[in-house]
Structures are given as C-alpha cells and as structure tokens.
Amino acid sequence: MYGIEYTTVLFYLISFVFVSYILKTITKIMDYIIYRITFIIVVLSILSNAQNYGINLPITGSMDTTYANSTQNDNFLSSTLCLYYPTEARTQINDNEWKDTLSQLFLTKGWPTGSVYFNEYSNVLEFSIDPKLYCDYNVVLIKFVSGEELDISELADLILNEWLCNPMDITLYYYQQTGEANKWISMGSSCTVKVCPLNTQTLGIGCQTTNVNTFETVADSEKLAIVDVVDSVNHKLDVTSTTCMIRNCNKLGPRENVAIIQVGGSNILDITADPTTSPQTERMMRVNWKKWWQVFYTVVDYINQIVQVMSKRSRSLDSSSFYYRV
C-alpha cells in the first residue's frame, strides 16, 4: 500500500519537473521570436521613412511622367482651424447638430474631422479681451453692424497684429508715445478717453491740466479704442476708469495666422492704410449677408484659398492678442 503511494507521489513530482522544463523552453523560444520580430519591425520602420521615390511606379508607360512624392504630407492633415462666430449665428441656425454638419463639409475640403474647432463669442468687447487664438489658423467672422464700424476696425487692428502692453497709471504719471508702433489701447463697456498735451514745463497745450473739461476727446463711448497721439510729447490722460481700462502698447508685427471675414456691409473695412501695418497684406475679406447657413457654406467653399494668405504658426497663442508685461 505504501509502495503505491510513493509511486504516485514520485510520478507527480516527475511530471511537475517535466512540465516546468517544457514551459521554460517554450518561454525562451517565445522571447527569442519576439525579440527578433521587434528588431525586424524597428529596422523596417526606419527604412520605410526614407524618400522612396521609385516604389510602385509602373514601367509600362513613358518615364517622363511626373509622379508625386508618396511621402509628402497633405497641407492640412496636421493643422488645426479655429472658426469664431457671434452668438447670433447659433441662435439663427437653431440646430443642435450644425457643428457636426460643418465638420463633415470641411472634411470634403481636406480638413479631417476633429481638426476644426468652433468658438462662440457674444460681442466685440468680449472677443477683444479674450479671443483665445489657439489654432494654427484662426478665422474670425464679424457681422457688420451700423454704428460699430470703428469698434470692428480697431478689433481687426488688434487681432491681426501682436502687441506688447504695459499697465498705465494715469493718476500718477504722464505718458508719451515713442513712435508709430506705440499706441494706447483702451477697452471696456464704454470708453471715453481725453488727453491734454504738455509742454516741457508740464503745462497744458491748449488745455488746463486741472480741468478735464478742457482736454481733447480722442475716444467717445467706445468699446475698444486704439489711441494715437503726437509722438514724443507728454500727455495727461482722463479715462472713464469705472467702465474702461487702458494700456500702453507696442505693435510687434502681424499675427499672420489670423484672418477676419466681415459679414455684410457695403464696403470692406480697410486697416492697411495704417503706416504701422507692415507688410501691407490684408487678411480681411467680406461675404454678402443672407443667412448664417449661407455664410458658413461660403467659408467652407473658400477655406483653402483663405488660409493661403495666412501663415501657420508653430505654436498656439492665448495672449488676448497682447502680451502683458508688469
């Protein structure tokens, strides 16, 4: 009886050792195969990235035929597009799936699904303060509103250029502009800006520094104002501080990944006459006003022509169109 039990135990022990040996052998073989396959994949992936101009070219016809480089990337496959529109557009369209519809239409123009972002703003003031120009290409739709031409024109100057801005303390200091690129930018729900130029003795020129009613008004009840005064002359300023803020800004140059489409209006607003706009390349265009669906269809149709006058940025910016320095 005891002999049978010992034999059974010995059998299971030998079986366990044998199975363990087989498993270890299989593991070594699998490791060898996996390492080999991984090595081959790495080598092939490196070789496949080379400029293989002759791969899959037919030899049946004339070799003078021009063939496109098969490794060339599509223009927009790795680009992002931000489309900014007023709240009025969404309200009028009144369709919960309208963005999905437009995304599919942009796909027909070479913009992959997920590369186009739709950003809503309520008014010019909100957009000028915090535009969030994140994308490689940024297209802003602004509906022309009679009486707001100046705000729209100055918004265009603001977002089509990069600015470096400092806070201004007009209660303590006088300020002067040092050149054509130096402007004072005020924004708020209602901005009225008055200035009093000063002579070398800090006396008012045509105004009294102690009486703001004698100051010259350079902006009156505007949401956004880019103030330009005589260079190299000190000025005392008066601003409606409760509804407006003002900054001392220098124009650094064009923001070439931004374009503006004016919706409606008899004439396109032109900011290229400004001597500080350099180079004199206008990234503003106009479409007729009918319905917002018609506007978006037009944008989709011409989006690739629009981005041709723009330059893709290698980095995204969220600087409210300015850089703040304190």
From Swiss-Prot:
Homotrimer; disulfide-linked. 2 Ca(2+) ions bound at each subunit interface in the trimer hold the trimer together. Interacts with the intermediate capsid protein VP6. Interacts with the outer capsid protein VP5*. It is found in: Virion; Host endoplasmic reticulum lumen. Pfam families: VP7. Keywords: Calcium, Capsid protein, Disulfide bond, Glycoprotein, Host endoplasmic reticulum, Host-virus interaction, Metal-binding, Outer capsid protein, Signal, T=13 icosahedral capsid protein, Virion. Residues 165-167 are annotated as: CNP motif. Some rotavirus strains are neuraminidase-sensitive and require sialic acid to attach to the cell surface. Some rotavirus strains are integrin-dependent. Some rotavirus strains depend on ganglioside for their entry into the host cell. Hsp70 also seems to be involved in the entry of some strains. In group A rotaviruses, VP7 defines the G serotype. Residues 237-239 are annotated as: LVD motif. The keyword Disulfide bond applies. InterPro entries: VP7, VP7_1, VP7_2. Residues 253-255 are annotated as: GPR motif. This is Outer capsid glycoprotein VP7. It comes from Rotavirus A (isolate RVA/Pig/Australia/BEN144/1989/G4P2B[6]) (RV-A). Belongs to the rotavirus VP7 family. Transmembrane segments: none annotated. Ca(2+) 2 binds at residues 177, 228-229, 231, 301. Glycans are attached at residue 69.
